[in-house]
Amino acid sequence: LALIFLLSSRYSDPSTNVSPLSPSAKGFKTAAVVPVYGEDENVFERVIVKLTRLFDRVIVVGDGVSEPYRSIALAHGAEFYSVPRSGKRGALEYGVSLLRDEKYVALVDSDTEVPDETYWKSLAVLESGYDALTVRIRYKGDNLTARAQDFLGYYNDVLNRAFARLGKVYVLNGQFSVYRAVKLREIIAGLSSRKLLGRLIVVGDDKELTSRAHMAGLRLAYLSSAEAVTYGASSLIVAVKQLLRWTRSGYLYLFMDLASLNYRRGFLYYIAGVVSVLYPILGASVTALGLTYPHHHQMLINLNDPFLWLVREWTKGLLAMIGVLPKEPRLFAVFVHEHFVYDSTLLLAGALKLAADLLTALATLGFVMQVLPKAREDPKGAVVSLGLLWIQGLLSIYSLITLYKVSSWLTRGQVPEKRSE
């Protein structure tokens, strides 16, 4: 049922019927804030050239770095500022503090390219009354890992559209999100000084802003029909490190949102979060049980056995309490159970099992129909993406096991990857 709901959300994109804003109708200013640290200079220059063509003002903030980014930014009409090394959060907060009279501001990663249509469509949606939005992310790269990441983004799009259907956003992604400037100023204050267990939080800046945006009651949108293009991981090791960091920050903010009673995140966020916690545990438990006790494992898979057992026990308990009608309630309960309850519960269990199988088949068919066109374009990437999903499940278990070391989650703990085209 959950999968059917997710798939039916494919038509909930608020930007589907919105035409890109005409440049002649733009009577306001826009800005882009770009934090940079260790990015490949060719990739960085390509991004800046594109942004300066679209935005009225591009603010580049070097996180403890200057050249060659300063020269590249100034050469293409962007502004450059260098701040002491403090992480992406500090660079973002400083860049936003430099805003003047801009109406909308985009937070853009230094390796993310923004197509013209995405820019103008984003402005059109914001002008319709939204306070912030994020778009679909496409991963660029010829290696199998990058192609698999792009396929994972295709899976994530299904989940993001479901959140948008409920007026929520799963995450205002850090690659490219656009905000109403006055609202961003309010929610970004103190971002770089956020602490947990006495340590500064460095990871999950996008998740932090998303939580704050929901808490502040901002109207958020996800645009499936618009995309930004970023570079995929250059190797499997880099991809695994990214997945581990994202998994940990996801759990971190799930627990923090629960602790702060941030009900505005919506029930789907917490359901998805709890499932993400329980699913790898249950999956590992059932697998271990199947290897140890094959018969019990089969019972868990087959809905008839546990369901019948529960219904029979409940029915026997219920009938045993009916002691006012017959003189011998125990014999009456046994008679009803043997001649009516057994056959009825068997029929009911069979009907529920059939209904579950049909719903599963329909949901699976719908999922395959959505994914198949993408899989035909890149069958190898599709296969490797399944492997990454399996790895992510293992990383989820590892993250939960190392929950007692949560303070070590608060830092990226790695040198930025140097990428080239």
Regions found by a protein language model. Give the residues of each.
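Long helical/loop segments within the catalytic core of UDP-sugar-dependent glycosyltransferases
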Residues: 90-91, 116-202, 244-251, 255
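Acidic helix N-cap motif at the loop->helix transition within catalytic regions
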Residues: 43-46, 66-74, 117
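Juxtamembrane C-terminal module of membrane proteins
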Residues: 2-29, 51-60, 69, 102, ...
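Catalytic donor-sugar/metal-binding loop of nucleotide-sugar-dependent glycosyltransferases
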Residues: 207-228
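Cell-envelope/extracellular polymer assembly enzymes that use nucleotide-activated donors
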Residues: 29-33, 208
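Short beta-strand-to-loop acidic/aromatic patch adjacent to the donor-nucleotide binding site
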Residues: 102-113
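Glycine-rich, basic loop-to-helix element that forms the pyrophosphate-binding segment
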Residues: 83-98
